[in-house]
UniProtKB/Swiss-Prot annotation:
NCBIfam families: citrate_citG. Keywords: ATP-binding, Nucleotide-binding, Transferase. It comes from the Bacteria. Its EC number is 2.4.2.52. It is an enzyme of class 2 (transferase). Belongs to the CitG/MdcB family. This is Probable 2-(5''-triphosphoribosyl)-3'-dephosphocoenzyme-A synthase. GO terms for molecular function: ATP binding; triphosphoribosyl-dephospho-CoA synthase activity. The keyword Transcription regulation does not apply. It catalyses: 3'-dephospho-CoA + ATP = 2'-(5''-triphospho-alpha-D-ribosyl)-3'-dephospho-CoA + adenine. InterPro entries: CitG (IPR002736), TriPribosyl-deP-CoA_syn_CitG (IPR017551).
């Protein structure tokens, strides 16, 4: 397999991760195979259209990383940002202006770009002379952090003087929450230090892959800064969801009971109009690195 084809095949793992996340059912408050959760402006097919619109750009992200691997992280970020804006426009066109994957597009631009850059310096992985290991995933995330660390300084350092604030900027001013920019600029610690170790351990149990993913989703809901929930319900609602997810996870239910409980919890979050979209995004990123490491 030639290098360009290999890079394309690896970018498809990001597409695959989004498809796995979409197909995962039942997901409390989220769009899945059975219902639209807390969303009245999107459904399963909206997400499919969105994923298809982003797929060509995922391939470009990893190619840009490969091409500019000798450039500075800041230079690489700027190239990826240009592509990311184009990808976002394609997404909005495909979904009739519904925001399905804006956050995950940002993260995959960084992480696929970082993957391409890392592969250019580790040809043995492209040549399949060795497998991706956890240390490779960690280094890729650290590179993404180097590429985006300026975001906090540039975007949030003078935010108090801005007139028109984004919701993320308002959260930063009011609560000190740095959201996706903060997570990225630190090299995705929630992914490398929590999500991936948890999921690797779940996969060792040899249980149904969907059950492992559902447990991962619950686990992510217990700790991440989920701006989707905060935006819809405020800080108290977010904290309550964290506690409820923790309680459900600690029950360690057998598969059929877990799905029953998640179906019930889906109705609860839907009634509250709450959607843990941040957890869903981090689940997709976890799946991407799990595919790279050939864990699933």
């Amino acid at each position: 397999m030639q290098t360009k084809e290999k890079l394309a095949s690896l970018s498809y793992l990001a597409v695959k991760s989004l498809l796995y996340e979409l197909n995962l059912t039942p997901k409390p408050g989220l769009v899945d195979c059975h219902n639209n959760g807390a969303h009245n402006d999107m459904d399963f097919y909206t997400f499919l259209d969105s994923i298809l619109s982003l797929s060509p750009f995922f391939k470009k992200y990893i190619e840009v990383g490969w091409l500019y691997h000798n450039e500075s992280p800041q230079y690489l970020f700027n190239q990826l940002r240009k592509l990311g804006i184009e990808a976002e426009a394609a997404m909005f066109s495909a979904t009739e202006r519904v925001n399905t994957h804006k956050g995950i597009n940002f993260s995959f631009a960084l992480l696929l770009g970082a993957t391409g850059s890392y592969l250019a310096k580790h040809i043995e992985l492209i040549q399949e002379k060795r497998r991706f290991m956890p240390q490779d995933s960690l280094t890729i995330c650290h590179l993404a952090g180097e590429m985006s660390m300026h975001l906090i300084q540039n975007d949030l350092s003078h935010v108090e003087t801005k007139r028109n604030l984004t919701y993320g900027e308002k959260l930063f001013l009011q609560y000190g929450l740095k959201g996706l920019r903060g997570e990225a600029s630190q090299g995705y610690p929630s992914l490398t230090q929590k999500a991936l170790p948890f999921f690797r351990n779940e996969l060792l149990k040899k249980q149904d892959i969907q059950i492992s993913q559902l447990k991962l989703l619950l686990y992510l809901m217990t700790f991440i800064e989920d701006s989707n929930i905060i935006h819809r319900g405020g800080i108290k609602s977010w904290k309550k969801v964290q506690q409820e997810a923790q309680t459900l996870l600690e029950k360690d239910l057998p598969p059929y009971q877990l799905k029953e409980q998640l179906n019930s919890y889906n109705q609860i979050l839907t009634d509250r109009h709450l959607s843990p979209g941040g957890a869903a995004d981090l689940l997709s990123l976890t799946l991407y690195f799990s595919f790279l490491e050939q864990l699933i």
